[in-house]
């Protein structure tokens, strides 16, 4: 068992000249870096409330983003929108190597990092 949180948020944009929705189907979704603070908060709340793993999703494009999700309590992370970056699938290696270097520098394990933000509340 586990839970994945979050993904795209409901969004809409309106042309101020015509008053018409810009997107063809009227509604769309907001994803990527713009939703990361919302995603981190959701992961923090869910990890605190649940006894099952939480996978953090939303705005992860750098190792620092993954670290932040893990600090909020995520057992793992998912990358989506960032795959469109020029780095492509190389982002996985970049995130893993950056996180590994960070943990070595901090002399911490991934488990010690997980949920650390909750220890300050």
Model-derived regions: residue spans:
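Glycine-rich phosphate-binding active-site loops on the catalytic face of alpha/beta enzymes
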Residues: 2-12, 59-60, 65-94
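Thr-Gly-centered strand-to-loop micro-motif
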Residues: 30-33, 56-57, 79-80
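Extended, intrinsically disordered, low-complexity segments
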Residues: 36, 97-121
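General structural feature for long, well-ordered alpha-helical segments within catalytic domains
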Residues: 38-42, 65, 91-99, 109
């Amino acid at each position: 068992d586990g839970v994945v949180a979050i993904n795209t948020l409901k969004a809409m944009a309106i042309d101020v000249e015509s008053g018409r929705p810009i997107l063809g189907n009227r509604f769309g979704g907001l994803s990527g870096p713009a939703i990361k603070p919302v995603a981190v908060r959701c992961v923090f709340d869910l990890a605190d409330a649940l006894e099952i793993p939480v996978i953090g999703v939303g705005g992860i494009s750098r190792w620092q983003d993954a670290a932040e999700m893990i600090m909020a309590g995520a057992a793992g992370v998912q990358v989506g929108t960032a795959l469109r970056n020029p780095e492509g699938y190389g982002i996985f290696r970049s995130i893993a190597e950056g996180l590994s270097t960070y943990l070595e520098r901090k002399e911490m394990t991934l488990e010690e990092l997980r949920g650390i933000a909750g220890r300050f509340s």
